[in-house]
């Protein structure tokens, strides 16, 4: 199973080297910054910024009260999804990483074949926490993003994911697993919150 879903018949390692071997000093700095922005420690900062944007957005003039109410509920749902998805994603990552304990590239491959930029990490490769967090941020905000902001969001997610490979911290399969895990978490939390809001509306109506 591992050979199919993780090794990809050798493509996982091949793709890692194809990305990790692209070396320019300016590119290293770009990738380091991408990893920096994709760190879970940025959650409080992103939450504050999101809350300020939500306050600004809901206080814009509305055509009628119904439009205003819809806008408020949409932003409340986004903030709730963002917060609960972060919490659930953290629990899953904290469980899966040590449980699976996949080796990172510097441990799984001959060390001289891996370009490492930044700290050397050896264990808990699957899934990528940075990639998961980046996907969680963008997927949570997706309902309130404009078309161009969605494009920017996708670019951000790919940037963070590629940075983990470029810096020698993860294999492509780790990054993809992080994306899938976080997207599934956001969708699950979104559906749960929508169901809860519908239930609250029904109770309020009665």
Q: Could you say what each language-model-derived stretch is?
A:
Residues 1-46, 93-121:
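N-terminal transmembrane-helix/juxtamembrane module of multi-pass inner/ER membrane proteins
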Residues 22, 26, 56-59, 98-103, ...:
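Membrane-interface elements of multi-pass transporters and channels
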Residues 26-27, 71-75, 145-152:
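Membrane-helix interface segments
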Residues 33, 41-45, 77, 147-155, ...:
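Alpha-helical transmembrane segments of integral membrane proteins
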Residues 44-60, 134-142:
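Hydrophobic, aromatic-rich transmembrane alpha-helices
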Residues 65-143, 200:
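Membrane-interface loops
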Residues 114-206:
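Membrane-embedded catalytic cores of phosphoryl/pyrophosphoryl-handling enzymes
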């Amino acid at each position: 199973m591992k050979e199919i879903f993780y090794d990809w018949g050798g493509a996982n390692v091949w793709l890692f080297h194809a990305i990790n071997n692209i070396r320019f000093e300016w590119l290293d700095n770009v990738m380091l910054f991408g990893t920096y922005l994709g760190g879970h420690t940025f959650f409080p900062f992103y939450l504050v910024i999101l809350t300020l944007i939500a306050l600004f957005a809901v206080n814009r003039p509305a055509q009628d009260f119904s439009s205003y109410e819809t806008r408020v509920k949409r932003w409340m749902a986004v903030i709730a999804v963002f917060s609960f998805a972060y919490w659930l994603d953290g629990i899953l990552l904290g469980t899966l990483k040590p449980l699976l304990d996949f080796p990172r590239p510097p441990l799984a491959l001959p060390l001289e074949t891996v370009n490492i930029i930044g700290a050397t990490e050896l264990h808990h490769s699957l899934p990528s926490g940075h990639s998961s967090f980046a996907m969680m941020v963008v997927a949570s905000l997706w309902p309130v993003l404009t078309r161009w902001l969605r494009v920017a969001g996708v670019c951000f997610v790919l940037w963070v994911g590629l940075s983990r490979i470029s810096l020698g911290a993860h294999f492509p399969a780790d990054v993809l697993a992080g994306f899938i895990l976080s997207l599934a978490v956001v969708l699950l939390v979104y559906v749960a919150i929508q169901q809860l809001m519908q239930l609250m509306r029904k109770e309020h109506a009665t």
